[in-house]
Amino acid sequence: MATSWGTVFFMLVVSCVCSAVSHRNQQTWFEGIFLSSMCPINVSASTLYGIMFDAGSTGTRIHVYTFVQKMPGQLPILEGEVFDSVKPGLSAFVDQPKQGAETVQGLLEVAKDSIPRSHWKKTPVVLKATAGLRLLPEHKAKALLFEVKEIFRKSPFLVPKGSVSIMDGSDEGILAWVTVNFLTGQLHGHRQETVGTLDLGGASTQITFLPQFEKTLEQTPRGYLTSFEMFNSTYKLYTHSYLGFGLKAARLATLGALETEGTDGHTFRSACLPRWLEAEWIFGGVKYQYGGNQEGEVGFEPCYAEVLRVVRGKLHQPEEVQRGSFYAFSYYYDRAVDTDMIDYEKGGILKVEDFERKAREVCDNLENFTSGSPFLCMDLSYITALLKDGFGFADSTVLQLTKKVNNIETGWALGATFHLLQSLGISH
């Protein structure tokens, strides 16, 4: 098999990541992601597998990673990834936890088909829920996780203690940053020419980058900085997760649905929607009636005023992001694809101003709307406001939009699996 950047950097991360980290009361930032006492049960096998579930607000995704270790004690090589997903996410089953867990059961069949039976009992299965469950009442989130744990317990796979839990939002940002910068080769050697990462989910959004200026470090609020050592270098990351600022949560805020008690019989209206539209939308297990302004204004300007109220003054704006280079994925990528700004397979490079240009084009032609998402104008306007008025990016800031790097899904799952393998003792 030909050596790829993905292979090279996977080997490097397993051997070189150290956990000298200052985050959340001096604890290691990944403490709690995986149990450090997990036994290296399948270390002696020549082929290793890991099952990682990403339980997001809009869907549940499974990543089945395959690693090859040619000789005992030799560093494993990332050989491939099997990916699948289901919609809606677990949070949609807030009052039917058993039904929610059944969606995970279906994805476990993908793992069974991908992993030889002889390896099942040696392969760990882990589920990390993100913002969708963080938004739920604690007792309801726990009920969902309990049912998932029962599904895991009945499965033929290795189920370590703590394998089903809700992941902290900051960990999402850090692990995604590690994944992208390893796979793009930015952390090779002693260089620190890294790229920042922007992740826009359904319920939350994350921004992570390596500050280059002392001013940024001095002016950053407490809790936004995380230090760790890698390749004999210390990296101090700026990272923060904003709960409630994901794309779909922002729709509710824009519509004013978060300020209204009870949704029955109420239709939420917006200048971001086609004037004639009357529809319903389900998010987080709740049904919302929504529509366009039948008599009021519609179009980009009134729409932008609505989304601006959601973000203005509510996010920290580090000045140096205006000059940084960032990878953007999840809904940034999806909406750019939906509007033909980038290719679905290849991704592409955009400037922040490109999102505003497309938002104006879509919003000012709402009466010609015929297909696709009725929220397209609102989503593009929100992304523009989030980038410019939320994070403080300049119009000219360049964004690399991608779904995969070297054929591996972007996001936190691979970065989390690195730590899973370390906890299994594979790098020893």
From Swiss-Prot:
EC number(s) recorded for this UniProt protein: 3.6.1.6
Posttranslational modification: N-glycosylated; high-mannose type. Glycosylation is not essential for enzymatic activity.
Gene Ontology cellular component list: endoplasmic reticulum; extracellular region; extracellular space
Keywords of the record: Calcium, Disulfide bond, Endoplasmic reticulum, Glycoprotein, Hydrolase, Magnesium, Proto-oncogene, Secreted, Signal
Substrates-to-products reaction catalysed: a ribonucleoside 5'-diphosphate + H2O = a ribonucleoside 5'-phosphate + phosphate + H(+); GDP + H2O = GMP + phosphate + H(+); UDP + H2O = UMP + phosphate + H(+); IDP + H2O = IMP + phosphate + H(+)
Co-factor(s): Ca(2+); Mg(2+)
Pathway: Protein modification; protein glycosylation
Top-level taxon: Eukaryota
Induction per the UniProt record: Up-regulated in cell lines and primary tumor samples with active AKT1.
Glycosylation sites: 232, 368
Secretion signal span: 1-24
Subunit structure: Monomer; active form. Homodimer; disulfide-linked. Homodimers are enzymatically inactive.
Family: Belongs to the GDA1/CD39 NTPase family.
Functional description taken from the UniProt entry: Hydrolyzes nucleoside diphosphates with a preference for GDP, IDP and UDP compared to ADP and CDP. In the lumen of the endoplasmic reticulum, hydrolyzes UDP that acts as an end-product feedback inhibitor of the UDP-Glc:glycoprotein glucosyltransferases. UMP can be transported back by an UDP-sugar antiporter to the cytosol where it is consumed to regenerate UDP-glucose. Therefore, it positively regulates protein reglucosylation by clearing UDP from the ER lumen and by promoting the regeneration of UDP-glucose.
Other information: May mediate some of the cancer-related phenotypes associated with AKT1 activation: its up-regulation by AKT1 leads to the elevation of aerobic glycolysis seen in tumor cells, a phenomenon known as the Warburg effect.
The protein, known as: Nucleoside diphosphate phosphatase ENTPD5
Species name: Homo sapiens (Human)
